[in-house]
Swiss-Prot record:
Cofactor or coenzyme needed: FMNH2
Function according to Swiss-Prot or TrEMBL: This reaction introduces a second double bond into the aromatic ring system.
EC number(s) recorded for this UniProt protein: 4.2.3.5
GO cellular component, one term: cytosol
Annotated keywords: Amino-acid biosynthesis, Aromatic amino acid biosynthesis, FAD, Flavoprotein, FMN, Lyase, NADP
UniProt-listed SUPFAM superfamilies: Chorismate synthase, AroC
Pathway noted in the entry: Metabolic intermediate biosynthesis; chorismate biosynthesis; chorismate from D-erythrose 4-phosphate and phosphoenolpyruvate: step 7/7
MF GO annotations: chorismate synthase activity; FMN binding
Cofactor note text: Reduced FMN (FMNH(2)).
NCBIfam families: aroC, PRK05382.1
Organism the protein comes from: Cereibacter sphaeroides (strain ATCC 17029 / ATH 2.4.9) (Rhodobacter sphaeroides)
Protein name: Chorismate synthase
Catalytic activity: 5-O-(1-carboxyvinyl)-3-phosphoshikimate = chorismate + phosphate
Length: 366
């Protein structure tokens, strides 16, 4: 199996399976001298780990990260950083009944067609368990960004679960860390809680939309045509399990706007040009403008549910499949820190690319 690595200069290779002994990431291209401690990476992993509330899978994994290489006396050496997370709460017996059946909505049948075999225990490599390694790598990227661009901030939050979207007029950033949904609207968070409780009782699941915003991003990251910042961000978000669509800025809604409404006007401010709006999501022509970079991605409903569904076996027999085990009623909840991690990795990669190409040179206005 190839294609386990992403990035250009800051490169991340993830490895491991859901029910294997461990999983992790090899991070290459981190600049030397960056302060990197396991405790700091653990902070980001703790935001993603399962079993923290009734709205996520009850699999109990501490997700304790170990740094095996690439640091000395708490700082990066410039050599590959190896991160490892042990799996401690696998229940492979939960999947014995589907060893020869394909779960509808899962990668099972596609893996079987491509490779001729598959790890049926929790999806193996296709499990969202793999994203723990991405969050660990994102912790390294955040540390490097903090050293190189001190004012840069990345924050993700849920904006919709099922048909229920937040009220943007009630957006409160302080609310994001106060509820299990990373929701910036307390009223909607309460609605989501009742909604998900009902779905859990009905043995069903639902999709969601996550928004990730990066502020303090320097202007000039990205490149025209094939090196666009937004194309790399979209590709990164699409690699997250269950993601089925990505928007930058106004996204699909831009198709409903007129040119006069969508184009972000510019005026001269005390410190230079200022945009009056941000429909572009902080990126024009594939290059960052200095405004907030705004990305949204849609996550499909969890495919593992207790409702019987029709499928087939490896022998070609028709069967009904009930997916046992411990699963999230809405995988979008734990996708929030994963989206943040992917944003961090892509921004650091483009920052290093830009420094290599332009040396930080910038055009001036005024």
């Amino acid at each position: 199996m190839s294609y386990n690595t992403f990035g250009h200069i800051f490169r991340v290779t993830t490895w491991g399976e859901s029910h294997g002994p461990a999983l992790g990431a090899t991070v290459d291209g981190c600049p030397p001298g960056v302060a990197i401690e396991a405790e700091a990476i653990q902070h980001w992993l703790d935001r993603r780990k399962p079993g923290q509330n009734r709205f996520t899978t009850q699999r109990q994994e501490p997700d304790a990260v170990r740094i095996l290489s690439g640091t000395f006396e708490g700082r990066s050496t410039g050599t590959p950083i190896q991160l490892m997370i042990e799996n401690t709460d696998q229940r492979s017996k939960d999947y014995g009944e589907i060893a020869r059946s394909f779960r509808p909505g899962h990668a099972d049948i596609a893996y079987h067609w491509k490779y001729g075999l598959r790890d049926y225990r929790g999806g193996g490599r296709s499990s969202a368990r793999e994203t723990a390694a991405r969050v660990a790598a994102g912790g390294v990227a955040r540390a490097a960004l903090a050293a190189l661009v001190p004012g840069l901030r990345i924050e993700g939050y849920m904006v919709q679960i099922g048909p229920h979207a937040i009220d943007r007029a009630r957006f409160d950033a302080d609310e994001i860390e106060r509820n299990p949904f990373w929701c910036p609207d307390s009223d909607t968070a309460a609605l989501w809680a009742d909604y998900l409780d009902g779905l859990r009782k009905a043995h069903d699941s639902v999709g969601a939309i996550v928004e990730v915003r990066a502020s303090g991003v320097p202007a000039g990251l990205g490149a025209p045509i094939y090196g666009k910042l937004d194309s790399d961000l979209a590709a990164a978000m699409m690699t997250i399990n269950a993601v089925k669509g990505v928007e930058i800025g106004e996204g699909m809604a831009a198709a409903c706007l007129t040119g006069s409404a969508n184009a972000d006007e510019i005026r001269m401010g005390p410190e230079g040009p200022e945009f009056l709006t941000n429909h572009a999501g902080g990126i024009l022509g594939g290059i960052s403008t200095g405004q907030d970079v705004v990305v949204r991605f849609a996550v499909k409903p969890t495919s593992s549910i207790l409702t019987p569904r029709r499928s087939v076996t490896t022998d070609g027999c028709e069967v009904e499949v009930v997916t046992k085990g411990r699963h999230d009623p809405c995988v979008g909840i734990r996708a929030v820190p994963v989206g943040e991690a992917m944003m961090a990795c892509v921004l650091l990669d483009h920052l290093l690319l830009d420094r290599g190409q332009t040396g930080g040179l910038r055009g001036t206005i005024g």
